[in-house]
A protein has these predicted regions:
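A cross-family kinase active-site recognition segment
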Residues: 112-174, 198, 308
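ATP/Mg2+ or Mg2+-diphosphate-binding catalytic cores
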Residues: 2-9, 152-164, 275-308
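Catalytic-loop signature of eukaryotic-like protein kinases
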Residues: 204, 208-210
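A glycine-centered beta->alpha junction motif in the catalytic cores
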Residues: 51-54, 99-115, 155-166, 271-287
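Juxta-kinase regulatory segment immediately upstream of eukaryotic protein kinase catalytic domains
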Residues: 1-32
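A conserved alpha-helical element in kinase catalytic cores
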Residues: 11-18, 51-98, 114-123, 127
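Active-site Asp-x-Gly
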Residues: 200, 211-263
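ATP-binding glycine-rich phosphate-binding loop
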Residues: 27-45
Length: 308
């Protein structure tokens, strides 16, 4: 495969992101003595610096997402919901430095000996949904699906058979033709799934984004916060984890997952994962992460069995 970022280019990008975070922190009055990279994939923690963005992402849209993340985390923290909160040492807004968009968060010590229990995390996701129901922020319907980027990514993948075969691209495009109207239009979604309540949801698989701190578990990573069905947050997790969520939902006093909506969320979630391969030239590790998803998707019914 050709056209991938080299290790040297990745190292330079990481170093540039660190430099931007340090400079932005100092501009905001923080004393920075020994910066460390805690995580280097999509979004580092503490000073979160997205370095690889979807093809249709604009600076304005990213700034709105980052502000929404800061706002909901601050609101949840004020309600007593266990979250990683924004840093109280700087203004609660995103900043841009040297072309990098940044947000600042409180440092929380991670329990590195803890093995994630995704069934327990799925169970706890219901409590998060119960807390989010009354969030007053203005959110767009399924904005986290980023349909423009998904369409653009399919176009890019059509030129990269080394990343996704032409047959796979053809199937993905036909699936997206079926699913896209339900993603773009709240009216179309509600007509297809009558009676399904929409609410603020995490947007990015909260069972996989529960932070295990030394003082307890914390909800985190709300950069894809959106208005949608709760099923969106359980997409592609499978029956066992969905059953754990349903148990938590009963305890939290909210509805169980709807099978039809879950099939829709699964189908869109798989397409979003597959089309993330378009980012692989800038983030080569995605090939290793996403190849198993592509292989699983090939064995699933067309569009997850969703019909219109």
């Amino acid at each position: 495969m050709t056209g991938f970022a080299t290790p040297e280019e990745l190292a330079r990008r990481t170093a540039s992101a660190v430099d931007a975070a340090v400079a932005a922190g100092r501009d905001l009055g923080l004393t920075v003595t020994d910066p460390r990279v805690l995580h280097d994939l999509f979004s580092p923690v503490v000073a979160r610096v997205p370095v690889v963005l979807p093809p249709a992402e604009t600076p304005e849209a990213l700034a709105r997402r980052q502000q929404a993340e800061l706002d909901v985390a601050h609101w949840l923290d004020a309600q007593g919901t266990p979250v990683i909160p924004p840093s109280p040492l700087v203004p609660r807004r995103p900043v841009t430095r040297d072309g990098f968009p940044l947000t600042f968060w409180q440092y929380v010590e991670e329990d590195r000996d803890r093995v994630p229990d995704y069934a327990a995390n799925s169970h706890r996701t219901a409590a998060l949904h119960a807390a989010l129901r009354s969030y007053p922020g203005d959110l767009s319907f399924l904005s986290t699906a980023d349909p423009d980027s998904l369409s653009a990514s399919l176009g890019l993948l059509a030129t990269r058979p080394d990343l996704l075969s032409p047959d796979d691209v053809d199937r993905a495009r036909r699936e997206w033709q079926l699913l896209e109207p339900l993603v773009r239009s709240r009216t179309a979604f509600e007509a297809a799934f009558p009676g399904i309540e929409l609410q603020p949801v995490h947007g990015d698989c909260p069972p996989a984004n529960l932070f295990h701190g030394t003082a307890g578990d914390l909800y985190a990573d709300f950069e894809l916060l959106t208005l949608g069905p709760v099923e969106w947050d359980l997409a592609t997790l499978g029956p066992e984890l969905c059953a754990a969520y349903d148990q938590g939902a009963a305890e939290a006093g909210i509805r169980r997952l709807d099978e039809r909506v879950l099939r829709f969320a699964d189908a869109v979630g798989r397409l979003r994962g597959i089309t993330a391969l378009a980012l692989a030239p800038r983030l080569p590790v995605l090939v290793e992460y996403l190849t198993p998803l592509v292989e699983t998707w090939r064995q699933t019914p067309f569009a997850g069995g969703v019909e219109r």
